[in-house]
């Protein structure tokens, strides 16, 4: 089962997917959006993602093989004793986190795919939200 989302976040339309894997007790949450043609710039995007991922705690970026575009993802582990409300709250919180992280990094993806900027130039465009925690693109806790 998958639930699709579409959110307007900081002026950017970000799509999302919530996929439940009941057999293994996890929910995969991803956020993605249109950031140009990633196929033509795959090496630079991989390098950018390689620089960003080590700074993150709860989420990670990848080039999604199905979507063929950058995506931010996280996994919610479902405790058997958790209530449905607790699981729903964790999933919604995680969707917010992956969406915020994707929106923060989207300008860097666009700098590479649309403006042919270098990886270092693109990295300087990552927008860290004011007062963000480390799980939101390396901010302070």
Regions found by a protein language model. Name each.
Residues 32-69:
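Short, internal acidic amphipathic alpha-helical interface segments
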Residues 107-141:
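Short, highly charged C-terminal tails/helix-capping segments
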Residues 9-11, 35, 76-80:
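Beta-strand elements of well-folded, non-transmembrane domains
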Residues 1-3, 25-27, 68-70:
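Hydrophobic residues embedded in beta-strands of well-ordered beta-sheets
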Residues 1-14:
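Ser/Thr-rich, low-complexity intrinsically disordered terminal regions
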Residues 17-39:
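Intrinsically disordered, low-complexity regulatory segments enriched in Ser/Thr/Pro
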Residues 9-11, 22, 65:
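A generic beta-sheet turn/junction motif
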Residues 63-96, 103-111:
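Well-ordered alpha/beta subsegment
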